[in-house]
Regions:
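N-terminal Lys/Arg-rich, disordered targeting/topogenic segments
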Residues: 1-13
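A surface/extracellular/periplasmic glyco- and lipid-processing/surface-interacting theme
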Residues: 2, 38-100, 105-354
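Alpha-helical structural elements
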Residues: 5-8, 32, 56
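Intrinsically disordered, low-complexity segments enriched in polar/charged small residues
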Residues: 9, 17, 36-37
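Functionally constrained cores in energy, signaling, and assembly domains
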Residues: 12, 31, 98
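Hydrophobic membrane-insertion alpha-helices, especially the h-region
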Residues: 14-29
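Hydrophobic single-pass membrane-insertion segments
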Residues: 25-42
């Protein structure tokens, strides 16, 4: 009887020990799983946080990325540049942030090149005289306005509007190379020195007149533009050929590559804005009649960038108001960071896109 009791006692001890060992083992396994689970969660949470943080930083960077072509508070400067064939090739156009091309007398065109004062090239020209309708576009930029002479209407508007100008006829800040009419040039230092002498501000808070993005924004849709031809007159036409590798348009005039006089580099446009405007003759000049434009009002056109185009409408309510350009859905166009050519073309000619 006593022996049986001892056996039961031993069994009881063994069961207790086994239970204790099992409990210890279970605790060890459970603790290890908890640690592993927490460790995995820590890694996952850290990875998720880092990924989300990267996305937020990238999105913020993309949102805040500012265009280089028009940055800072440096004053805008407009220079009237000849585009008669005798003036080719011109100097300094590659530094411009925007260039307007409009029809003038004799079926020729003239450029108004716009720069930031801190990005003026050493040589700009040949510089020619002002025409009154360019001043309506210049008002959108509030620039120091450099020209060599003026038409009667341009003279009136410059004086009436108080345009801060540099006129080569009276202001000896230009220099000549060679003979003829297309031989006047102006330098960066001459413009800045004259501005300081006259007390013209060299800083501005003037915003870019159109929407401008620091990112590369493509036009929606499938309207491809690899080649563009614009006709200004029987004498003058402009063509662009798309360079898909660099996402720019290479510029030519009358079948000849448009190059810079100094660098010999072909002129490249990131954006091309075509505005169709009615032009007509004025009777204020003996010889080839000077032109006028119906550029205050509204019309149609095209916007071309990155190998695509969209039809647009334009509206300019008065001379000192910006030209508002919208696509056919009513959204204002967004220009990409780079040189923009504003092609103000006679509306009687077709725009060829292919």
């Amino acid at each position: 009887m006593r022996k049986r009791k001892n056996t039961r006692k031993y069994i009881k001890y063994i069961v207790v020990i086994i239970c204790f060992v099992i409990t210890i083992l279970l605790m060890f396994v459970f603790k290890r799983n908890i640690l592993n689970y927490n460790g995995l969660n820590k890694i996952n949470i850290k990875e998720i946080f880092n990924n989300q943080n990267d996305k937020v930083i990238k999105a913020k960077y993309e949102k805040e990325k500012k265009p280089k072509i028009y940055s800072g508070n440096s004053r805008n400067v407009a220079v009237m540049v000849s585009n008669e064939k005798a003036a080719w090739p011109q100097a300094g156009l590659l530094n411009a942030y925007m260039i307007y091309e409009c029809i003038i007398e004799g079926g020729e065109t003239r450029f108004m090149a716009l720069y930031k004062a801190d990005n003026l090239p050493e040589k700009i020209g040949p510089v020619r005289s002002s025409r009154h309708y360019y001043l309506d576009y210049a008002a959108e930029h509030d620039p120091i306005y450099a020209h060599f002479g003026w038409s009667d209407l341009a003279m009136q508007r410059i004086k009436q509007r108080g345009v801060q100008n540099i006129n080569g006829i009276y202001d000896k800040y230009y220099y000549r190379e060679g003979g003829g009419y297309n031989n006047a040039f102006v330098s960066k230092n001459s413009i800045l020195d004259f501005a300081k002498q006259k007390g013209y501000p060299l800083t501005t808070n003037k915003e870019f007149p159109l929407k401008l993005s620091g990112r590369n924004v493509d036009i929606e849709g499938e309207n491809i533009c690899n080649n563009l031809k614009l006709t200004y007159s029987q004498k003058h036409n402009v063509t662009y050929k798309y360079d898909a590798e660099n996402k720019v348009y290479l510029r030519s005039m009358r079948g000849i590559n448009h190059v810079d006089r100094v660098t010999k580099e072909q002129i490249k446009a990131k954006n091309i804005v075509v505005l169709k405007v009615k032009n007509f003759n004025l009777n204020d000049y003996v010889g080839s009649p000077r032109q006028d434009l119906n550029n205050i009002g509204s019309g149609e056109g095209y916007y071309i960038t990155n190998g695509k185009y969209t039809k647009v409408t334009w509206n300019k309510s008065q001379y000192n108001q910006n030209t508002v350009i919208k696509d056919l859905n009513g959204k204002e166009i967004v220009l990409n960071d780079g040189l923009t050519f504003m092609q103000i073309v006679p509306d009687k000619y077709d725009v060829e896109i292919y």
